[in-house]
Design a protein with these regions (language model features):
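PLP-dependent amino-acid enzyme catalytic core
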Residues: 1-221
Length: 224
């Protein structure tokens, strides 16, 4: 007898669904009908798309009885700040491996990381060059202290993390069914490619007609 797949662990963190907003004046200026998906409204310290990924990453972490989340990024990483905020909200320990030296003064996301109680490790260029190994070394030290760590790669770029934007794409499809335009293109910025991958999965599963276009930022198209 066929059995259904087990539910995918998920922690509801985002304020969703986020609205679709037509950019009236910009559309008139450019002669193209433009809409924006307001994922800047997902909540929890302006976490944007990161919180959607973390719903599934943290869900998997908790399913594995993790009490510590380990991730990495630049000194002003939005993703690291988001992980720190989620850990503060859920009572988990956050360990952030950040690229660069400890500054004399703290500002921006780095200041928020500290205020949120994250344990910050500053990585040398050599440590950053082998960041996967560095993260596993940190995890080993956490285990030696009796903790149960869960590693989140930079920007949450895993298959599990991509499920966040599968859910977002399903949300868009639902909004289209309830009166939003049938978009012919959905454009999204690309760093790791995870969010675009999630939208492509949603396109296949929901029948969205839009072409999913990723626009690389900071790194080249070949890397994405």
């Amino acid at each position: 007898m066929a059995t259904s797949a087990p539910p995918i662990p998920r922690v509801e963190l985002a304020y969703a669904p986020t609205p679709l907003l037509k950019l009236e004046r910009l559309s008139a200026e450019l002669g193209v009908e433009l809409w924006v998906k307001r994922d800047d409204l997902t909540g929890l310290l302006e976490t944007g798309n990161k919180i959607r990924k973390l719903e599934f990453l943290v869900g998997e972490a908790l399913a594995q009885s993790a009490d510590t989340l380990i991730t990495c990024g630049t000194l002003q990483s939005n993703c690291c700040r988001c992980v720190a905020a989620v850990c503060a909200r859920l009572g988990l320990r956050a360990v952030l491996a950040l690229k660069g030296a400890q500054p004399a003064e703290y500002d921006g996301n780095l200041l928020l990381d500290r205020l949120l109680g994250a344990d910050i490790r500053y990585c040398t260029d050599a440590e950053w060059a082998k960041i996967d190994e560095t993260l596993h070394d940190i995890a080993a030290r956490e285990r030696a202290q009796g903790r149960t760590p869960y590693i989140i790669p930079e920007s949450g770029a895993t298959v599990v993390g991509a499920l966040g934007y599968l859910a977002c794409g399903q949300e868009v499809a639902q909004q289209v069914r309830h009166g939003a335009p049938e978009f012919d293109t959905i454009a999204i910025t690309d760093f790791s490619g995870g969010s675009q991958a999630g939208l492509l999965m949603a396109k296949q599963l929901t029948g969205l007609r839009a072409e999913i276009v990723g626009v690389p930022i900071e790194i080249g198209r070949a890397h994405v």
